[in-house]
Amino acid sequence: MAKKVANIVKLQIPAGKATPAPPVGPALGQAGINIMGFTKDFNARTADQAGLLIPVVITVYEDRSFDFVTKTPPAAVLLKKAAGVQKGSGEPNTKKVATVTKAQVQEIAETKMQDLNAADVEAAMRMVEGTARSMGFTVEG
């Protein structure tokens, strides 16, 4: 018989840097998860993606066991990395802070494809371009 789901916890944690300290520890503690077990598993699974923010969905079962699924980093994080900037524009309609190429947008769209609700890479590219525009980035090409 399948285990009964008690809770679902969604977090965004830097890859390879999950620690029992806030904000990760308290969120997991409230759900009744073995914090050290989760942090070791998460850090091992995301060690190759250092420097990126990784969304994770943790499913907690009634017997306090858990499993988790890591997602691809948010498009905004990938765009900032591609453009080499710390943050987007405060006024995206008037102040453009960076430029990304179509090739960079396509690469990000292909990376994000498994998590996006898009039929093909073209649709995913349009989503990523929209995110770029809302951050004050110019898309060239």
UniProtKB/Swiss-Prot annotation:
The keyword ATP-binding does not apply. Keywords: Methylation, Ribonucleoprotein, Ribosomal protein, RNA-binding, rRNA-binding. GO terms for cellular component: cytosolic large ribosomal subunit. It comes from the Bacteria. GO terms for biological process: translation. One or more lysine residues are methylated. Disulfide bonds: none annotated. Transmembrane segments: none annotated. One of its GO terms (molecular function) is structural constituent of ribosome. Part of the ribosomal stalk of the 50S ribosomal subunit. Interacts with L10 and the large rRNA to form the base of the stalk. L10 forms an elongated spine to which L12 dimers bind in a sequential fashion forming a multimeric L10(L12)X complex. Forms part of the ribosomal stalk which helps the ribosome interact with GTP-bound translation factors. NCBIfam families: L11_bact. Belongs to the universal ribosomal protein uL11 family. HAMAP family: Ribosomal_uL11. This is Large ribosomal subunit protein uL11. It comes from Latilactobacillus sakei subsp. sakei (strain 23K) (Lactobacillus sakei subsp. sakei). The gene is rplK.
